[in-house]
Amino acid sequence: MDNNQISDALSRTSLNAMLQDALDILEADDGKSFEEKRDAVISQLKQKNDSELARLLAERAIADKAGAGTKDAFWKCGRIIRVNNNVVLRPVKPCDHDGFLLIQQENSMIRSMVKEEAFCDMVWKEHNEEKSLMLSIENMGSYIGYCGIKDTSQDLWEIAIELKRDWTKHGIGYPALSTMLNAIKSRLGVTEFRVRIDPTNYPSQKLFERLGAIPNGLSELWLHDQRALEKFEEENLHLIDDRIVEVAKKFQVEPRKLLSHVLEYRLSWAGKGEADGQV
């Protein structure tokens, strides 16, 4: 074993020890709040001279706090936002849990992972994070999906929307998103957004283009290593069809690039319809 290997092994051991210490603090049944435990973890990391990791955790804590302020500012203007006579937008509730996980299960890309309890807990927790501004979509009192912003700590907010499979192609996406964007504009003053869409998700592309989104390049999603991306593209060239070619022309890229990337859109929202359907 050379010096580099020894150094790597020591680094891994040190990191594992720090992570275990952090877990011990977070999982301790000592009656302390999550915020108190989080501050204790950051303090301990600083004592261990791991300033970079402490900085990242501190930034996460700040993002959570800022996100909580954004979420409070949004919902204090009204917790029910009417889309039409049957559909409303409201804050996420614990009773949405099963419906939300059903939507994740219907997503073929992560269907196998939804069987894992830890994964389900993780995605549900992310859905409820302070920095995420998620609005549940109800139709006549029944949960049918959600729309919202993934991370309000980012400079450019990314829009998300998912509906239960039985409720797709029912004309709900456009009015729900329009209503949400109107509310965000009137309540928070935010009008610039990003959208990322799978190259083969043609209905979503059509929906956001109808809302005014314009192509803004490509984004990496699962893979980031350039050689791995090229290898993946090479192995899947047979998947390129006429529709992929048309999308590639619209985004002015080689069709093969759509095999390893997602579409990036930019949306500047001027407002349509009612300013805010709050109740």
Predicted regions and their residues:
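Acyl-donor (CoA/ACP) binding surface of acyl/acetyltransferases
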Residues: 2-13, 17, 39, 43-44, ...
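Short amphipathic alpha-helical heptad-repeat segments
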Residues: 11-22, 30, 34
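Charged, low-complexity interaction regions
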Residues: 24-38, 50-53
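A short gly/proline-enriched turn/hairpin at secondary-structure junctions
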Residues: 88, 103-116
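Active-site rim helix/loop that mediates acceptor-substrate recognition in acyltransferases
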Residues: 113-133
